[in-house]
A protein has these predicted regions:
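Residues forming the flavin
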Residues: 1-81, 121-123, 127-457
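Dinucleotide-binding Rossmann-like beta1-alpha1 core, especially the glycine-rich loop
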Residues: 65-115
Length: 457
């Protein structure tokens, strides 16, 4: 079977590539290959009753399937060049913002209308942060919520399913360069195309690395972010979340001058497990619907680690720390902040007596046995710094779940069109190492679709 264009990965980059290609040229013969399930079949078996922890499904419904890892996220689209990737370095700052706004318009068209667009513009919290050695990054944030985000994806799939051929539960094994075009091989068949877009996300990092080796595409080591997910009463951060929803706050530690940042803030949200390459880490979700909201807010505190020669395996470093947590706790570990600073392990009794009711069934433990001292010291410093702008953050009963790890793909060598050294082979989204967010990944998909159509004219 031969197609004009094959897209590998049905995450945000792949979806928006397919959408824009159809808009630009409805006559194109397009196929999308996805290792995971269709959206309606993506169900995590963890129910909190019979199954309380990850059972390592062959295809993780949280990380893979139509919508990618973002399908069950809280649907935050950050419209900014300040964080979320370096797409602007390839296509220019103005065009990057314009594409993110275009993605926002599409999300509104397909079910997101009525959701709020938050902005840091003119906020007094910027000054408050500066007065306490913190930096609030500028951004506009569209919060869809996990529930509305799911509806948008349903509607996008309904729009595309009769115009694009989808192959679900069909992992691609290899990508072979022909002259011209490409051949992709799956377990039972091979397919050819004139042009290929690879958009495999962070969960496809190991696969992407192998493909780059096979095709002699240059890469360079990126980074890994390691930290914890903080859970506390929603009222403590309500003055920030009511106005900004998500605040990206950065602190530079006193001793090591490491940057510690807040990430993925979920007002009235829940803490969840996440499975990456068989390793269980922690994440957070939130919902737009009031009936699904909790009394807690959660967010990540992350320390970015960049490595120099000779070490190149930043993701392997993060995985080893996450595996240690899994070994000690059988999955995710939870600890009271008060216990952490006193050097003692948390137990179920002290957590149950605290004022924060956990939203994830995790194993009480001691994070100091898991996280490197430099990272843990930075997190503790950051919590005390946040306590100055949100009093109560450093309460003894504040819960810390570990570990949270954000893996980044090796950064693939691409030109200004996001095209590799092989003509017609484009690599986009988080799988490229260029983007690290829903908005940037989606925008990269739109951009490449337009580049392909323009180049084929």
């Amino acid at each position: 079977m031969k197609y004009d264009i094959i897209i590998i990965g049905a995450g945000p980059g792949g979806i928006f590539s397919a959408y824009e290609l159809v808009q630009q040229n409805p006559d194109l013969k397009i196929a999308v290959f996805e290792a995971g399930h269709p959206l309606e079949k993506r169900h995590c078996p963890i129910d909190g009753d019979k199954i309380k922890s990850c059972i390592n499904c062959k295809s993780c419904s949280i990380m893979s399937g139509f919508g990618g890892a973002g399908a069950f996220s809280d649907g935050k689209y950050n419209i900014t060049n300040a964080f979320g990737g370096t797409l602007y370095e390839y296509i220019g700052k103005n065009q990057a913002i314009d594409l993110m706004k275009y993605v926002d318009d599409i999300n509104m068209k397909f079910g997101g209308e009525g959701t709020k667009l938050y902005s840091t513009a003119g906020t007094s919290f910027k000054k408050l942060c500066m007065q306490n050695k913190l930096t609030l990054l500028d951004a506009s944030v569209r919060h869809l919520g996990t529930d509305i985000n799911f509806i948008v994806l349903e509607n996008l799939y309904a729009e595309l399913k009769d115009k694009v051929t989808f192959y679900f539960d069909t992992p691609v094994k290899t990508v072979e360069a022909l002259d011209p075009g490409y051949r992709i091989s799956c377990e039972d068949a091979s397919y050819e195309c004139n042009q290929c877009i690879i958009s495999v996300g962070r969960s496809g990092s190991k696969w992407m690395e192998q493909i780059c080796k096979d095709l002699d595409i240059n890469t360079k080591s990126n980074r890994v972010d390691i930290g914890v997910r903080v859970e506390l009463p929603a009222v403590i951060f309500s003055h920030l979340t009511d106005e900004l929803y998500e605040s990206k706050i950065v602190y530079r530690t006193e001793k090591f001058e490491d940057a510690v940042r807040t990430f993925c803030m979920n007002p009235h949200g829940i803490v969840v497990n996440e499975n990456t390459n068989g390793i269980v880490t922690v994440n957070g979700h939130s919902y737009e619907g009031a009936d699904k909201q909790t009394e807690n807010t959660n967010f990540a505190l992350l320390v970015a680690k960049h490595f120099s020669e000779p070490f190149k395996d930043s993701n392997g470093y993060g995985e080893s720390i996450a595996r240690l947590s899994n070994m000690l706790g059988g999955g995710v570990i939870v600890q009271r902040f008060g216990d952490l600073v006193r050097g003692r392990r948390s137990n179920a009794k002290r957590i149950a007596e605290g004022m924060v009711e956990p939203t994830l069934a995790a194993t009480p433990g001691d994070l100091s046995l898991v996280l490197p001292k430099r990272i843990l010291d930075g997190i503790i410093e950051m919590i005390y710094a946040l306590d100055k702008i949100a009093p109560g953050t450093a309460n003894d009963d504040t819960l810390l779940y570990g570990v949270e790890v954000k893996f980044y793909n090796m950064e693939v060598e691409l030109d200004e069109h996001l095209e590799s050294c092989h003509k017609g082979l484009y690599i986009i989204g988080d799988g490229s190492g260029v983007t690290h967010s829903l908005s940037h990944a989606s925008a990269s998909g739109v951009y490449v679709a337009r580049q392909i159509v323009k180049g084929n004219e």
